[in-house]
Amino acid sequence: MAAKRKTGFTLIEMIIVITLIAIAMTGITAALYPRSQQSAEQVLAVKAAELGRAVLDEVMGRAFDENSGPNGGVPECVLVATTGRETCTLPSKLGFDKDENANTKTLYNDVDDFHGLTGSVKDVLGADISADYQRYNVEIKVFYEQNNGGVMTGQDAATITDYKRISVVIIDPSGNRYPFAATRGNF
């Protein structure tokens, strides 16, 4: 009578298979890790772009200057003192008007009221929405822009011009800076 042969795996064969699977899993994980990191960075960038556009839209929705008219800036403020017309705000006076501060955003009536605003994210009504944008920060700078023969330079002008540059920088939780800018005309 012939002896039955036993079937199955030996302990050594099982250890070899486990080792090969571990090596394969390590290689696959190492190949996929950079992609997951890039994916997270893209999510932060998209969120920053969304926030930057919203902040810029909020600022651009205001009048050119506190001395401009309420109907689309008509009558517009003037660069040089003229009888019967309001002069635009001096470059040194850009920023909060009287009775305005960082906590009274609903009182902002012109773009330069946002000048120097920094910190966590607040909506149009001044409510804190930093829960939706955790660890995101906003920096806003408004200045008169130099106009070199119809070409906007993006540079700060020392005198009043017909153009204000609104510069918004969004800083994401990783510290990456996302700049946004627009020019508002005095028309």
Locate each region found by the language model.
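Low-complexity, Gly/Pro-rich coil/beta segments used as flexible assembly/activation regions
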Residues: 46-50, 56-187
